[in-house]
Amino acid sequence: MDVVVYAPASIGNVSVGFDVLGAAVSPVDGTLLGDRVMVKAGDEPFSLKTAGSFVSKLPTETKENIVYDCWVVFSRELDKKGISVKSLEMTLEKNMPIGSGLGSSACSIVAALDALNRFHGQPLNETELLALMGEMEGKISGGIHYDNVAPCYLGGVQLMLEELGIISQEVPCFDDWYWVMAYPGIKVSTAEAREILPSQYRRQDVIAHGRHLAGFIHACHSGQPELAAKMIKDVIAEPYREKLLPGFADARKYATSAGALATGISGSGPTLFSICKEQDVAERVARWLEQNYVQNEEGFVHVCRLDKQGSIVTGSEL
């Protein structure tokens, strides 16, 4: 049966958890901030169509598209189980800017693999599918990591564990927080953002990082939103990556003065997130970011909430 899966935007790192924390977000106004993938029966083993507002940024060659790679690894896994892959046609609706720090590649990967799995009657379980998603993310960024694909697929705030067969688990967070997401419209490559980081860190930074991350997780589990927000600090990446983001320091300064609880870089940037407790504060911060952080017509600002669902079926037609 034909299926369409939507996969939401995500915040890698959430400042405090470099490479081990991620959060899925969705705009409060119902805008779909994420990619959709449709899978339906086809005449050939595989064919791909593309659509969406950022379709022009995709490779023109089918075999260079990550959705094709998803089909290849999904077929490989089904072959191991003695299951044949159906002839199918996939359509990627690319609604997410590439190199934005919003988990754009994760959106395509999660929507594609989830849709393929559902189209075939879900032969792969959640952990098997998530492992494939991490493998595909690694193909793009150069190393397997789950801090975008896990929240995008499973929803909420996810902590990467990768032990005892557990890839990630959800961290209880605060449903009343507003997450203002501001994408300036420029591109920052994940590879460049990683190269700028030091190969070694000072002991006091390592201690501070451990305190902040442990404190954040503890505050989430014990229901202390003010403490959790105070712990959202990054000594690992943001001090070095700020120089790649024009206007970030000013934006954080304004957001703090306007009443935001915390502001940080989403993933490797250039998108920033700002957490606010009150909607009027979130809207004030959003207006300022639209006027001062967004640099061109491709940029945007959304007031979001945590997306607790992750990837979902939205029907059978795009």
From Swiss-Prot:
Belongs to the GHMP kinase family. Homoserine kinase subfamily. The gene is thrB. InterPro entries: GHMP_kinase_C_dom, GHMP_kinase_C_sf, GHMP_kinase_N_dom, GHMP_knse_ATP-bd_CS, Homoserine_kinase, Ribosomal_Su5_D2-typ_SF, Ribsml_uS5_D2-typ_fold_subgr. It is an enzyme of class 2 (transferase). It catalyses: L-homoserine + ATP = O-phospho-L-homoserine + ADP + H(+). GO terms for cellular component: cytoplasm. ATP binds at residues 97-107. HAMAP family: Homoser_kinase. Its EC number is 2.7.1.39. This is Homoserine kinase. It comes from Vibrio atlanticus (strain LGP32).
